[in-house]
Structure formats: structure tokens, C-alpha cells
Amino acid sequence: MLILCMHTTYAQDIIGPIALEDLKKEPHAEWFTTEYENYAPFDKTITQLDAVQEDVAIVVFMGTWCSDSQMYVPAFFRILDEMEFLGEVQLIGVDKDKKTPTGSATENDITNVPTFIFYRDGKEINRIVESPVAFLEDDILAILSGADYKHTYEN
């Protein structure tokens, strides 16, 4: 008699509030660290971002299971680190149905991830949905500087 035993390990998805440090630990560190280190934002744009970051807070809805989140969220934090972002950033994990235990994804009309929502003085000013229109730092600059920005899914 032959008995085969197989063991499969699946990455645990994080649903609800996420501490950035949790993405820097396994099983998420593999993709987070690689994408963070490989992303090279444009220096000129970083300098411009520093001048428009006042009174900005950001909420990021992401799926640790989502390839777009795995690519853009680390790049986003690289940009924030390069510009020495001073505001608050809140990370929220969603399940594959784009839901959260508290209903915050539904309340914020999250249809695709990642979604980066930018607030100034407590009011939403705009959002990046799933992927940037140009480069991530260019989209952030357009939003924070008040340019006419439409995310990927806006008509």
C-alpha cells in the first residue's frame, strides 16, 4: 500500500484593517518587498508632490490576493516614502467580493482594487481605481494639485 501525503500552504488574505508592517512579513513580504524595491519613481514628480501634500489623508482598499494590489500598493508606499509623506494612510483589505467586515468597502463604492482614495480636510478629492491612468506618481500629482483627473473607470 502506498500512501501519499501532500501539504499545501496558501497565503493568508488579510481582510479589514492592515498594518503596513504585516505586508512586510511572510507570506506577503515576497511580493511587497520585491515590488517596493523595484519601483523607481520619477524624482521630478516626487519633488512636485512634496509641495502639494498638505492636509492630505489617504485610504487604500486592497486585496492581498489581487495581482494589481500586489503591484501598485508597494509602489505607492515607495512613492510616499520618497516624498516623505506626512499625512495619515489607512490600509484596508477586502475579500474577493470586495467586501469588508465593517461594510467600509461598500460605503466607499469599492468596485475594483486597489483603490486609493485621497482626502483633503476630511473631504474626498479623488481616487485612483485599480491602475493608474499614467504613472502612479503622475496620477497622485494630478489629484493633489487639483488637475482635471478621471480614474480608469470614469467616463
Enumerate the predicted regions with their spans.
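Local sequence-structure signature of Cys/Sec-based thiol-disulfide redox active-site neighborhoods
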Residues: L49-M83
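Thioredoxin-like thiol-disulfide oxidoreductase module
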Residues: I92-N112, L141-L144
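N-terminal leader/targeting and pre-domain segments
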Residues: Q12-Q53
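Non-catalytic, surface beta->alpha helical segment in thiol-disulfide oxidoreductase systems
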Residues: N112, I117-E154
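Thiol-based oxidoreductase modules, predominantly thioredoxin-like and allied folds used
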Residues: V60-T64, G87-T100
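Loop/turn elements at helix/coil->beta-strand transitions in domains of secreted/extracellular proteins
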Residues: E54-A57, G87-E88, D121
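Bacterial Sec-dependent N-terminal signal peptides
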Residues: M1-I14
